[in-house]
């Protein structure tokens, strides 16, 4: 039996509905795959008739192909990944490749063949391919039943212009849209459980995510910053995070805690955080702010308090977890691989100078009056200028030539 080149066929769903913009989404996904599969023996990646095909080097083992497919499935924009072989547009070769693919698919009691002919210059139509190749595969596996509805295994055959692709093992991807196809957002990122999940959900919708972490430094240690860095390294494996700004926030919290009404501290902290995030967002050309808030989960996340924090900024604020309960968020965190990191205790600004009885139904007028006692605009500029950027692997992100600090320093000089 001949040796055939191994491939991973990448199927997508939403991208296929994009009409005239479809090619842009396909190319964005292709570029993201190229960047994140550099550790695997990939020869090239091509667009073929509504799919992306990842071609692997000659001699690539089955296990390596499966590892590559597992990496692909976690890239936003991927609906399904199929492991298989490239062969000639020849029924004998399609049969041989099908036998190989079935042999690597584990145990199954029934199967069917599903062929798709994308070029009519091949004389055998899809139904005939199903019948001919299906009959031959049935002879090769006489103990296995042919079952047209809900079989254990489906052997797919894609006949394109100059080749055929045959596969049997398919695994679901995470779906969504490729990162970089939906603009840029600024995501508040703590070392806790919720915010990394919120960031991932927005990245899965195609946004380039830039994190901003408010550290309790110098009033606390920098332990939370190391945890956030670990979280970012998990998220960067799939290109979901481009950069994290670390903002030393502790001294400003202390100023608020010393002078503001105790019950309003948390809201004033968050309003200042939002303003700083928005200031950095303008520099990064980000179009929205993202938080990990879930309605009613803690005191700051009631409707009145959410309204009071939203009032501080002009950018839209996205809350991907707003309707999720804690168990759902934890389960998603475990699947992402961030949960073990987020479960570690570290002092941060979320626990610093917390009041005993925080306001749960803030009056917006009272909040604005309390905030007016502080030089908020000055603080926003100081905090944004002090923000420390840390970059991660995100092929869709193009950093500006001048840093935020340099740009703000130049403006101050003017």
Predicted features by range, described:
Residues 1-186, 196-242, 359, 364, ...:
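RNA-binding accessory domains that recognize and position tRNA/RNA substrates
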Residues 132-137, 143, 170-182, 249, ...:
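Active-site adenylate/phosphate-handling loop in enzymes that bind or generate adenylated species
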Residues 187, 211-213, 246, 291, ...:
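Structural beta-sheet core signal
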Residues 192:
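Conserved G/P- and acidic residue-centered "switch" motifs that form tight phosphate/ATP-binding loops
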Residues 232-259, 346-349:
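A conserved beta-strand->alpha-helix junction
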Residues 297, 345-353:
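Small/polar glycine-rich anion-binding or flexible loop at a beta-alpha turn
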Residues 337-345:
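A short alpha-helix-loop-beta-strand transition element characteristic
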């Amino acid at each position: 039996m001949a040796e055939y080149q191994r491939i991973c066929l990448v199927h997508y769903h939403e991208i296929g509905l994009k009409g005239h913009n479809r090619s842009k989404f396909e190319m964005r996904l292709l570029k993201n795959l190229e960047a994140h599969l550099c550790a695997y023996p990939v020869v090239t990646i091509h667009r073929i008739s509504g799919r992306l095909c990842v071609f692997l080097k000659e001699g690539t083992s089955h296990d390596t192909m499966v590892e590559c497919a597992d990496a692909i499935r976690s890239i936003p924009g991927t609906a399904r990944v199929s492991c298989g072989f490239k062969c000639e547009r020849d029924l004998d070769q399609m049969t041989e490749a099908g036998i190989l693919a079935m042999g690597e698919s584990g145990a199954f009691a029934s199967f069917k063949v599903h062929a798709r002919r994308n070029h009519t210059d091949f004389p055998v139509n899809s139904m005939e391919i199903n019948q001919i190749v299906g009959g031959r595969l049935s002879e090769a596996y006489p103990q296995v039943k042919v079952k047209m509805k809900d079989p254990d295994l489906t052997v797919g055959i894609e006949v394109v212009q100059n080749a055929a692709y045959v596969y049997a093992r398919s695994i679901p991807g995470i779906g969504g849209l490729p990162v970089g196809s939906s603009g840029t957002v600024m995501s508040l990122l703590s070392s806790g459980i919720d915010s990394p999940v919120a960031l991932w959900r927005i990245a899965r919708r195609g946004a380039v995510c830039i994190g901003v972490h408010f550290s309790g430094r110098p009033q606390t240690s920098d332990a939370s910053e190391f945890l956030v860095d670990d979280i970012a390294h998990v998220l960067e494996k799939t290109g979901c995070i481009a950069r994290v700004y670390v903002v030393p926030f502790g001294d400003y919290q202390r100023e608020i805690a010393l002078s503001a009404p105790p019950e309003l501290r948390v809201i004033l902290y968050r309003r200042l955080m939002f303003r700083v995030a928005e200031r950095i967002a303008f520099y990064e050309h980000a179009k929205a702010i993202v938080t990990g808030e879930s309605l009613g989960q803690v005191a700051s996340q009631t409707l009145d308090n959410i309204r009071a924090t939203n009032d501080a900024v002009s950018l839209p604020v996205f809350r991907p977890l707003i309707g999720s309960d804690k168990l759902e968020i934890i389960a998603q965190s475990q699947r992402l691989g961030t949960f073990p990191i987020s479960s570690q205790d570290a002092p941060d600004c979320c626990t610093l100078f917390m009041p005993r009885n925080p306001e749960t139904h803030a009056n917006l007028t009272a909040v604005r009056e309390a905030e007016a006692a502080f030089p908020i605009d000055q603080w926003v500029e100081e905090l944004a200028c002090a923000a420390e950027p840390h970059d991660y692997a995100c092929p869709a992100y193009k950093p500006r030539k001048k840093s935020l600090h340099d740009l703000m320093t130049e403006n101050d000089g003017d």
